[in-house]
Amino acid sequence: MSIQEEPMTTAAISPWLLVREGDQQHPVQTLQYLLRARGHNLTVDGIFGPVTAAAVRTFQQQEGLAVDGIVGPVTWSALIITVQQGSQGDAVRGVQEEFQFRNLSGDPNQGLQVDGIFGPQTDAAVRGFQQALHQDIPSVAVDGIVGPVTWQALVSGMLSF
């Protein structure tokens, strides 16, 4: 008697997107919000122009990273800020921007407001997103905390409605 093994399929979080000078829109706005949250003075306009490029290079230098002006996995990982209910500011705006971009708020008529306040609506949207991820990737916690795994899933575009 022979036993055949079924092929193992393991879902994983999509890789971080590479973002560089000249890119526009998503996820440049999120990048700009995170740079602002790290103290860089720039306008969130969705354009990765000279000002954003300079802020990225400065951030990379401050963090001891390779200074190439390209936002890849190492820079994203250093840039993200864990946020949860009660958090406020530009990092929260970055999360909310991701939800708006992909219509992940769960409400087809009203997107999540980008107001920088991690309140009940943002918490519900985050938990719903995490629950959807958890179905395919059981290691994803459904805790309402936007940490490294949830940030990566958001920025890389794991789900859209």
Where are these predicted regions, by residue range?
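Cell-envelope/ECM-targeting effectors and their regulatory/trafficking segments
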Residues: 1-161
